[in-house]
């Protein structure tokens, strides 16, 4: 409640609380209302509405922008779970449009073509919670200082190769653990190295975790991938091309949801990994020229 007794909306506490509600779940990319219904039926906690999944964006090239409002509204109408949508890095007007459309979360995404190579969106100006990607702790803290309510380790979207997701999750976790052993004067140096506000760095050092929910993304294509990322410290999973670019998407979606819930139970993981058909063929991250890697977008 605010001082006048009205419900608090758009505050950091409210927005972070909305992101916390998704913990332990799977968020799936969908391009049609039918896919959204499949995702909801499989147990997804939210869907990401976009016109092309990352694998298609990578294959087709060109400039990728915010999805058509009619398409987004069609998906909002098709499901009862929260709906996210992506905007280009720095494109605050796309974010204004999505907020007006009534999406539940906005993803300032490196998967789309950046609109601004120097500035990210000032997310404090919005009542809708934002999700942002990060490859390391400094990047995560900078996004949080701009108002992000959820961080996802980036991985390399649209590849089906989970190696970058593990690299980024381990980097964030390792840097957090390093902070927890530092003295106060060392934290000032760390804040300078991380290019992040000292207050946030000190908060992470005290808590041993980020002050917002940490999901993982990029290259997750199997139940085992999802479970591994959860064991590495993720609090939930984004799955993009890995479901609807694979065989038997309904079964694969449900299996990934179950693997995310029972990530530390090998018996369950073995059971849900059976009979899923062929996983997406994908592409090895090492085969992608550095200049074409999506994870490097942002700063």
Curated annotation (Swiss-Prot):
Alphabetized SUPFAM superfamilies for the sequence: Ribulose-phoshate binding barrel
Binding site for D-glyceraldehyde 3-phosphate: 170
Gene3D superfamilies for the chain: Aldolase class I
GO BP of this protein: amino acid metabolic process; pyridoxal phosphate biosynthetic process; pyridoxine biosynthetic process
Catalysed transformations (reactions): aldehydo-D-ribose 5-phosphate + D-glyceraldehyde 3-phosphate + L-glutamine = pyridoxal 5'-phosphate + L-glutamate + phosphate + 3 H2O + H(+)
Chain positions recorded as D-ribose 5-phosphate binding sites: 29, 158, 219, 240-241
Keywords: Isopeptide bond, Lyase, Pyridoxal phosphate, Schiff base, Ubl conjugation
Top-level taxonomic group: Bacteria
EC number of the protein: 4.3.3.6
Entry annotation: catalytic residues: 86
Isoglutamyl lysine isopeptide (Lys-Gln) (interchain with Q-Cter in protein Pup) cross-link, renumbered residues: 271
Entry's Gene Ontology cellular component terms: plasma membrane
Pathway as given in its UniProt record: Cofactor biosynthesis; pyridoxal 5'-phosphate biosynthesis
UniProt xrefs under CDD domains: pdxS
GO molecular function, one term: pyridoxal 5'-phosphate synthase (glutamine hydrolysing) activity
Keyword Ubl conjugation (UniProt): yes
Family: Belongs to the PdxS/SNZ family.
Job of this protein: Catalyzes the formation of pyridoxal 5'-phosphate from ribose 5-phosphate (RBP), glyceraldehyde 3-phosphate (G3P) and ammonia. The ammonia is provided by the PdxT subunit. Can also use ribulose 5-phosphate and dihydroxyacetone phosphate as substrates, resulting from enzyme-catalyzed isomerization of RBP and G3P, respectively.
Self-association state and partner proteins as the record states: In the presence of PdxT, forms a dodecamer of heterodimers.
Protein name: Pyridoxal 5'-phosphate synthase subunit PdxS
Organism: Mycobacterium tuberculosis (strain ATCC 25618 / H37Rv)
Name of the gene: pdxS
